[in-house]
Regions:
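NTP/phosphate- and nucleic-acid-binding module
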Residues: 1-478
Length: 478
């Protein structure tokens, strides 16, 4: 009995969201803690989710001319220090290698927290003429940042990501690329992960160290906290000048190039868990799920059941990412709970009577609804159901985002809305850093972004009363 109940043993989501989250991560076998403090082991099921994200995003990148490359994980200290704002922004998070081969190194090497400096150094060697531009490079790799407080996928010292770095002939072209990649991130998150995004520009306080401007795709979790899901940065010439990325322009004159960078990470796995989470474990959108459907034979010990259901599975396994659960050491109930915990979108149940009548039962992971269909129609029915689940999961998140987005006209109202409703709070903003700091100090909520879709909510800033022409969104974050 204890074994059958094991998959149900997760903390109530309303009682302790953080504990619920780590319970799901471990019991759905997505990741586990290691003896290396602050670093996780991503298990095969969790890594399969990342592979699906990677496959989808990489194809989108290549459609717009991006090519993959790879840079060293070790960066010399002198290289890191070439861009002052950048090194100051990352200094507290950098891990250093000081010994090699039993000897002290002449120069410290940092373990890659991000690769702007290494990419810029190499691009400077490769760019001579405007004909060499643009360079549209991306790498899928690991990075290390010495985080003090860690949580699986959301904030760990070592994590996986992609970082794109591009070099352009003109500022206009670079700015267009920055927004183009942000749109691809929105596509990945909305169409693959079924999570609606809020797109906008970060305030100068919140933008990336060394950037002229940072753009973000923000997401809202089931508990009303925000998660920054991806960012795209326009650097202007902030890196090309110190790193001497120059080219001969069309008039034969030498000038500095323009640069961008953009990235998403395994943090998106955390976003999927928390955006679609509820008390019965993991719930995965079909397009990103490692297993889209599982076939569980009922009364498999009865004559012909295993053979016939196995044949049905064989007819479907090349159409969908599927599993056939023919384990004989656990009950069907355990199997149901096990696959629910793993978030498999569709369960197919077929027993002896179903086989006699030519029927199968489809069970939706997102709603627990049971649907009886003809076995001969299974392929079409599963295909349609997976699309329905994908859309319904997205729409449920849209509805929650709308319900948890409020408007405030005073600092007290911002505080009240966040206390009562969590979520996003929209206000006008004068643009002053002091007002931004005040909201964070009083409410604990930093600015999320200045949305691309602006609304004129009022004429003045709710914090200082000065004239305001920008709408900004606030929200507590992960």
């Amino acid at each position: 009995m204890g074994k059958d109940n094991f998959v149900k043993e997760i903390t109530n989501i309303e009682e302790d969201f953080a504990k619920w989250y780590t319970d799901v991560v471990r019991k759905a076998e997505l990741a586990d803690y290691t003896d290396t403090k602050g670093c996780i082991a991503i298990r095969p099921y969790g890594y399969a989710i990342w592979e699906n994200i990677q496959k989808y995003a990489d194809a989108k990148f290549k459609e717009v001319g991006v090519t993959n490359l790879y840079m060293p994980v070790l960066i010399p200290e002198s290289m890191l220090q070439k861009e002052k704002d950048h090194v100051e922004g990352f200094a507290p998070e950098v891990a250093w290698v000081t010994m090699g081969g039993g000897e002290e190194l002449e120069e410290r090497l940092c373990i890659r927290p991000t690769s702007e400096t290494m990419m810029s150094t190499m691009y400077a060697k490769w760019v001579k003429s405007w004909r060499d531009l643009p360079i549209l490079g991306n790498q899928w790799c690991n990075v290390l940042r010495w985080e003090k407080e860690t949580r699986p996928f959301l904030r760990s010292r070592e994590f996986l990501w992609q970082e794109g770095h591009t070099i352009h002939e003109t500022a206009k072209e670079a700015e267009e690329r920055t927004l183009m990649m942000l749109d691809i991130y929105a596509d990945v998150i909305e169409n693959l992960l079924a999570i609606p995004v809020l797109k906008g520009r970060k305030t100068p306080k919140e933008q990336f160290a060394g950037a002229d401007s940072t753009y973000t795709v923000e997401t809202l979790m089931v508990d009303g906290r925000a998660l920054q899901a991806g960012t795209s940065h326009y650097f202007g010439q902030n890196f090309t000048k110190p790193f001497e990325i120059k080219f001969q322009n069309r008039e034969g004159k030498e000038e500095y190039a323009y640069q961008t960078s953009w990235g998403i990470s395994t943090r998106l796995i955390g976003a999927v868990i928390m955006a679609h989470g509820y008390n019965r474990g993991l719930k995965l959108p079909p397009r990103v799920a490692p297993i889209q459907a599982v076939l569980v034979p009922i009364a498999a010990h009865k004559e012909g059941v295993l053979e016939k259901t196995s044949a049905i599975y064989d007819s479907l396994k090349n159409k969908f990412r599927m599993k056939f659960d023919d384990r004989d050491n656990v009950s069907p109930g355990f199997k149901f709970n096990d696959w629910e915990m793993r978030g498999v979108p569709v369960r197919i149940e077929i027993g002896p009577r179903d086989l006699e009548e030519g029927l199968a039962v489809l069970v939706r992971r997102d709603t627990s609804e049971k649907i009886t269909v003809k076995i001969e129609d299974l392929e079409t029915e599963i295909e349609n159901l997976l699309e329905t689940i994908q859309k319904d999961m997205f729409n449920a998140c849209v509805e929650r985002k709308n319900n948890k987005t409020t408007v405030a006209y005073s600092l007290e109202e911002i505080e009240k809305n966040l206390a009562e409703n969590q979520g996003y709070v929209k206000t006008m903003w004068c643009g002053d850093r002091a007002c931004e700091d005040k909201v964070k100090e009083v409410t604990g909520a930093p600015s999320r972004c200045m949305p691309f879709e602006q609304e004129h909510l009022a004429d003045t800033c709710p914090i200082c009363g000065k004239k305001a022409d920008k709408m900004i969104v606030w929200g507590r974050q992960y």
